[in-house]
Amino acid sequence: MKHSEESRIRSTTVIGVLRDGKAALGSDGQMTLGNTVVKHSTRKIRSLYQGRLLAGFAGATADALTLLDRFEEKLEAYNGKLERAAVELARDWRTDKYLRRLEAMLAIVSSEKALIISGTGDVIEPEDGIVAIGSGSMYALAAARALMKHTGLHAGEIVQESLRTAADICIYTNDHIVVEEV
């Protein structure tokens, strides 16, 4: 069953950056139901596998949390190997009837790797070490790329400033920003 546009809880920006052997992942806090903001301080970032990984989610909240739980199971099964766990989750996502109906995306970072698991079950590893998902993702991505290219800011600062830029532009992104680092 597809979520109707009015009943879908959506609207977020999650961005992760790798720089100098460190990773940061951050998100805004806005949750929207249809055209109404229902919460300003939603936590969309989770620390995983004994604090070695960070995961953020966008999309239908219940769907995203289901995927996050499945991803954690895969991490445990594959001893924290990020890429292997992501590929196995994507494989399940594509073949399982129930999972295929989930409308969510995950952005995952470690100190060495940044991945997106898309809503179609694809695993994407961006070449520039920047992952961005959600309604304000393209604004945050553009800001992060410019900051990576033209400043010496560390990963957490880039994430923070990129989210501020997205919040200034995207109506579904607010400035209640949470950034975590590994």
From Swiss-Prot:
One of its GO terms (molecular function) is metal ion binding. It comes from the Bacteria. SUPFAM superfamilies: N-terminal nucleophile aminohydrolases (Ntn hydrolases). It is found in: Cytoplasm. Gene3D superfamilies: Glutamine Phosphoribosylpyrophosphate, subunit 1, domain 1. Protease subunit of a proteasome-like degradation complex believed to be a general protein degrading machinery. This is ATP-dependent protease subunit HslV. It comes from Chlorobium phaeovibrioides (strain DSM 265 / 1930) (Prosthecochloris vibrioformis (strain DSM 265)).
